[in-house]
Amino acid sequence: MNDFKDKVVYQIYPKSFMDSNGDGFGDLKGVTAKLDYLADLGVDYLWLTPFFPSPQRDNGYDVADYRAVDPRYGTMEDLEELIREADRRGIGLMLDMVFNHTSTEHEWFKKALAGDKKYQDYYIFKDGTPDCCPTNWVSKFGGPAWEYVPWLGKWYLHLYDVMQADLNWENPAVREEMADILRFWKAKGIKGFRFDVINVISKPEVYEDDFEGDGRRFYTDGRNVHKYLKELVAAGGIDGMITVGEMSSTTLENCIDYTAEGNHELTMCFNFHHLKVDYKDGQKWELREPDYLAMKKLFQTWQEGMQAHGGWNALFWCNHDQPRAVSRFGSDTTYWKESAEMLAVAIHFMRGTPYIYQGEELGMTNPHFTKIEQYRDVESLNYYRILREQDKTEAETLDIIAQRSRDDSRTPMQWDASENAGFTTGAPWIGIADNYKAINAAAQMDAPDSIRSFYKTLVALRKKMPVISAGKIEFLYPDNADLLAYRRYDGETELLVLCNLREREIAKPLPVGWTDAEKLLGNYPDTADTLRPYECVVLKK
């Protein structure tokens, strides 16, 4: 039995959450200090992005030691206190495991570079000459996916940054190291794990050029990935714990296999297809208006497909890699509150486990930076250079980055209207959104009609109503590009969810039998015969 159906996970990016010592960086003591805020929201788990020792080339996703705490975030004692204090409030901690690659500063990689054959086999090294990469694969961060090491006469694979060397999962010693890391953290009282890009760990037997793409078809959901996951879960002793896999460019069929209960792999999956509907020609760094019909079709395919075959979805709009949803799919000006609440309803009533990213419950927006110097994200800085080389103007380039950068969601949590939004008494590591005096936790905590109070209601309803956590789902009006509509039902209760995706009034179609249904929830105080801009309504019978 999946015990996580009525649970809600809150994602924390520690670097930007709360700074307890005034150095400008969020830390573990900062998280502990805000546990009452999180307990009040009603969330069950906190997923913390990596706080392990790291050169911070990719904000901690370049891990140099999987069993320690980076001094910038505090000490192991701070973490143990956080685990204890969270536990006392009925909240479990989930850690982020970056198992596809390590930092090139990791002890294993240093030994590999020093010529140690054992540790070279921990990574993917290929013999070659400096003028010819082993394949033409492209890194996810731009540029070649291989780096040459002259004194070894070898190339190593890095699907991400050049300082993130891919691990060789074909090597049983690597797989045992990963399982041992899970055992270590489980013994510390960690209650769950999120696995970073876990579906790219299984590489091909033969490395060949990709003349149709960037190489991803050769390693995405690779030939041994299900075998490796089953082994990792069993050897790590984590079967039955809450686990979520970040799945890059995956398929519905694979995610069913990853999450079906009898397979003993993961409890749920993140997939990102619905967050690519505003990519022009599938390209992240090319802008277009969101294709809501495509988004609806994706929701329906994944929701109904997972339901039919026993899979389980993670539900989300936001994370540390995505722009803020209210800026992206809503309005962060005129209809800020309405669109933030509509987007919340759209996914919180679906079949799956909802994830709330820090500040999402406040309606935090993109910061709308205007200078490249304001950005810290390695991907954004790389693409600034690439886009300028493609002859895009400075203004065009900055507009694209302002809408697409991972830094959009990494600006500090807006706690109150004081200097630096109450995040730090020092100089923050990255700038704070200018609107923090209006959009902050203190302003919303006790306001019954705030976005935060709305989120609190959504969390409580999932716990109270089995139809939300365990009922079936059926999508309605699939060809209506303005309206997301679906029905939840379980034999006792029925819910009808209607979400206006547009910044204008639209018709409000009601299926037969719903005219006199009770209004469970809405983001406008009264009821109308139409759906007003970004209006959502949930009916019950």
Where are these regions (language model features)?
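C-terminal beta-strand-rich structural cap/linker in extracellular carbohydrate-active enzymes
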Residues: 526-541
